[in-house]
Amino acid sequence: GVRLVGSEMCIRDRYIPYAGELGLLLPLGISFYTFQSMGYVMDVYREIVEPEKNFLKVALFVSFFPQIIQGPIAIYDKLAGQLYEGHSLRLENLQKGALLVLWGVMKKLVIADRAVNIINFVMDKPMDFSGTYVFFAAVVYALQLYADFSGGIDIVRGIAEMFGITMSTNFNHPYFSRSLTEYWHRWHMTLGDWCRNYIFYPLSISKRFLNFGKWLKPRFGAHISKVLPGCIASVITFIVIGVWHGANMKYLYFGLWNGIVIMLAELFAPVNKKVAGGFFKLTGLREKGIFATIVSVLWTFMLILVGYYFDIAANASTAFHMLFKSVTDFHISELGINNIILNLGACGLDEYDILLLIICTLLWFFISFVEENKKLDMRDFILSRKLPLRWAIIYLGIFIVIIFGYYGPGVNPADFVYMQF
């Protein structure tokens, strides 16, 4: 698995930057296309699935049109059967699929394409801004990336659903996670599943890693011997995930940061549990109460944000300087709405755009919060309303896109972020 991924990344990063100069035609979404192909080949090799003898059926699985540009990455035995059987057009599928497409378009055009102006403006010369605005740009990037990527996936899944095809969920409200491990089970879930199945598990249960665990037990105890081999496999997996994003040291640091933080959390889990237990006993707070949840979610978001500094910066050195500046030159008073408009007004957004961005983001997270806590599918909720209210909500969504979408003359449309992979 690791060798195949390495080969794909080598080809992509070595030759794709020069594709235009060489006059080469390259397939859209080469990484997603390659990952699905590799997954199928490895499943056949492991005898998890039967080899498909019909080349056209395999080609359909690999190149199913909605997903090929930016995923989600499908597992053969979960998707292939749906593609090979007949589907009749059903009103329920058309309605639910169209609602998901509309929701994705709203996130992309109203939030992501507007927010990217702030990010580009600050990241063009990040050292010219105070640490406050570097941090603010990183927060905006976290929101923009989520809106852009999840919006694109919603459009893909919605189109497939209209044809009666159910594709894997790729996001599950990741910014409500209480730990970095939980975040990676909620973010880009199909990539996470792929890496666990074809990189992490083969490494962690390999003979070398199992023998390493046996060697550790008499020297460092049961906990370390049980956890450390898996932690090392996890770090290697995150390095692969990081480098998959590009042949740049900043992506290596991105992978290392996530892998090492998760490794430390696992290694020190018993200590953390005792400390947390003592704190809750002393204060009388509940471990899963509102206060503990808010603190855990905010702390996790800050850990996520540190990783994003390496993603957003031009290079690793700039990322470290940005992190240092965010800590040493941060002034909360600069985050007032008037100061934001004054300092970031040249990014191409006016006061109306910034206020609209804030309001729409808050509305988006309110809906996500309701879905998360009530275990509610908003599409089912809308379609269960009486006809007048149902269509009022749908038309409201359409009008929001038409009126508040960031497009038109003078606007440079932003590609989906993950199209570059």
Regions found by a protein language model. Name each.
Residues V2-L4:
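A short, hydrophobic C-terminal helix/tail in secreted or cell-surface proteins
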